[in-house]
């Protein structure tokens, strides 16, 4: 199978599998019976409106949140059955770009990017410096940012440093949480290009959580759309679209076309109906 | 909703029982959560020590940077004690005994409690705010995704720094308090130096110093655990961080005072078991 977004081979082997995953916080159910398969080398975009559970899904995949019911398998192994040590061992096979980059405030850019290398490898300081410089160049940042603290950087720069940090250990899976949120259109496109380049340079499987259709179309092979549980009828599946990125415009479900066209009128009417106005 | 005054009373009692039950459940859940947090900290502490580059900044921040403020407050507490006690002692013509009472109070009680209070105020609330901010801005999640355990990386170094350095801070508070009291009593109030020192030497022993230092270890551990727990369980937003910092100080201070009382009673018991002939205070 060849990826539509980047002409890269996608294996048919599943690397991440979710089976009947429910996530409940107190009385608030966020995810219901999620079944998902991700093939090795594939880039999946998860779209949906704010609050539908996209980030929760991403955090469940890496074991930051635990499913209330169901299982998440990574490479055929159930994350729920792993000890904390085993889970940490698996996590270093992932790279995670957080929505606000989540850089460590107390460290410089160089220390942030080199953090995993210092924690999990026996590389000498000189080797770590070289890798850090290479990663910074890869995300298109100048060398002089290395000594700066995250607070001194712009939003776009922070995202790129976050990406460089996530790539430091050459992960097998990259998880992007709203990579273009809060950025101007040009910087958003820079980040999209970086996601595509990352895939070209490293053989990674990626999941991109976004509500930016431009990003989803540009970087993903496949798109799934989540729908908020509060607006679903009982028994309706939460994933209302699962298919190739280039065919999302032809989706039969009107809720998908409403979302991708950014149509607010029907949503506003629904909100008014719910609020009794 | 029932009608009549009896019905209203029944409703009020039912509400009260329900609210009380909810508070009790919350407290039990919090206690369980704190216990798990403490156990995980000790498990990591006994399992693998953090790297030197993680420990050093915490030791510097918590120990070295706290020294000046502890020294300053210690000096003033010593002098204030002399000012407050002098008139009463002079009225009884026993002002030369002032050294014994003040130094005993400083070494056994005020030195460790003062050092711990300053640590809780200066370091505890800052730790809670820092970790709270890290929680809110997903930095703790980032640590986890990078395969680092946040308890091992963030809590254990702070716990070790508080535990191992609070005795030094207590010694500093003791020393500066004793020196401040001596200076005020001897040079400003003209109390006879020989008798002041002789009474101090006679009444204050090694066990008193040990009591103060031993208690301080518990205070340091409590401050670090409470502050880190509050930071880790911070509510979202700037308000959550502020609340975590305040709660860290208030809870630490209450726990310091409770521990002070309990340890004071226990250590007195040990003292009179070892030396049954020693004169009793009461």
Predicted regions: what they are:
Chain A
Residues 62:
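Helix-to-loop junction immediately C-terminal to a conserved catalytic motif
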Residues 70-78:
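Conserved ABC transporter NBD signature motif
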Residues 77-78, 125-144:
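Conserved ABC ATPase "signature" region
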Residues 106-115:
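Short coil-to-helix segment of the ABC ATPase nucleotide-binding domain corresponding to the Q-loop/switch region
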Residues 149-153, 157:
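Conserved ABC ATPase signature
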Residues 170:
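Conserved catalytic motifs of ABC-family nucleotide-binding domains
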Residues 174-177:
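Catalytic Walker B motif of ABC-type/P-loop ATPase nucleotide-binding domains
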């Amino acid at each position: 199978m060849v990826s539509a977004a980047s002409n890269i081979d996608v294996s048919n082997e599943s690397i991440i599998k979710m089976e009947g995953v429910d996530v409940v916080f107190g009385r608030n159910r966020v995810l219901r019976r999620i079944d998902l398969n991700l093939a090795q080398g594939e880039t999946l975009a998860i779209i949906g409106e704010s609050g539908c559970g996209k980030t929760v899904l991403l955090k469940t995949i890496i074991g930051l949140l635990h499913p209330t019911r169901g299982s998440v398998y990574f490479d055929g192994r159930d994350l729920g059955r792993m000890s904390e040590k085993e889970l940490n061992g698996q996590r270093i096979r992932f790279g995670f770009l957080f929505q606000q980059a989540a850089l460590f405030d107390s460290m410089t850019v160089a220390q942030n990017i080199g953090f995993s290398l210092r924690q999990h490898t026996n590389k000498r300081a000189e080797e770590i410096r070289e890798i850090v410089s290479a990663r910074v160049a890869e995300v298109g940042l100048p060398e002089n940012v290395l000594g700066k603290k995250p607070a001194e950087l712009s939003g776009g720069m922070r995202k790129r440093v976050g990406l460089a940090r996530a790539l430091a250990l050459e992960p097998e899976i990259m998880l992007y949480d709203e990579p273009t949120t809060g950025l101007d259109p040009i910087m958003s496109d820079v980040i999209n290009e970086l996601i595509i380049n990352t895939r070209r340079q490293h053989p990674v499987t990626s999941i991109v959580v976004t509500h930016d259709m431009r990003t989803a179309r540009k970087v993903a092979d496949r798109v799934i759309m989540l729908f908020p549980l509060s607006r679903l009828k009982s028994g309706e599946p939460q994933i209302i679209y699962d298919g190739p990125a280039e065919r999302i415009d032809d989706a039969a479900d009107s809720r998908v076309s409403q979302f991708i066209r950014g149509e607010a009128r029907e949503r506003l009417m629904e909100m008014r109906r719910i609020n009794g106005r | 909703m029932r009608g009549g005054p009896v019905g209203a009373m029944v409703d009020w009692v039912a509400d009260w029982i329900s609210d009380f039950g909810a508070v009790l459940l919350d407290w039990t859940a919090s206690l369980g959560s704190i216990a798990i947090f403490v156990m995980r900290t000790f498990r990591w502490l006994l399992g693998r020590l953090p790297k030197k580059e993680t420990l050093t900044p915490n030791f510097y921040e918590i120990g070295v940077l706290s020294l000046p403020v502890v020294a300053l407050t210690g000096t003033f507490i010593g002098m204030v004690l002399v000012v407050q006690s002098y008139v009463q002692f002079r009225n009884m013509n026993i002002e030369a005994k002032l050294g014994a009472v003040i130094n005993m109070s400083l070494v056994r009680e005020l030195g460790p409690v003062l050092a711990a209070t300053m640590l809780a105020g200066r370091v505890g609330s800052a730790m809670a705010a820092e970790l709270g901010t890290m929680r809110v801005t997903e930095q703790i999640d980032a640590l986890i995704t990078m395969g680092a355990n946040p308890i091992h990386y963030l809590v254990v170094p702070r716990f070790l720094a508080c535990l191992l350095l609070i005795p030094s801070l207590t010694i500093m508070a003791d020393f500066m308090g004793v020196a401040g009291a001596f200076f005020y009593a001897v040079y400003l109030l003209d109390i006879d130096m020989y008798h002041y020192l002789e009474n101090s030497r006679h009444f204050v022993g090694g066990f008193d110093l040990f009591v103060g230092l031993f208690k301080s270890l518990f205070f340091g551990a409590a401050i670090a655990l409470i502050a880190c727990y509050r930071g880790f369980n911070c509510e979202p937003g700037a308000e959550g961080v502020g609340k975590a910092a305040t709660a860290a100080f208030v809870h630490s201070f209450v726990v310091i005072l409770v521990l002070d009382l309990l340890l004071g009673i226990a250590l007195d018991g040990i003292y009179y078991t070892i030396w049954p002939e020693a004169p009793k205070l009461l």
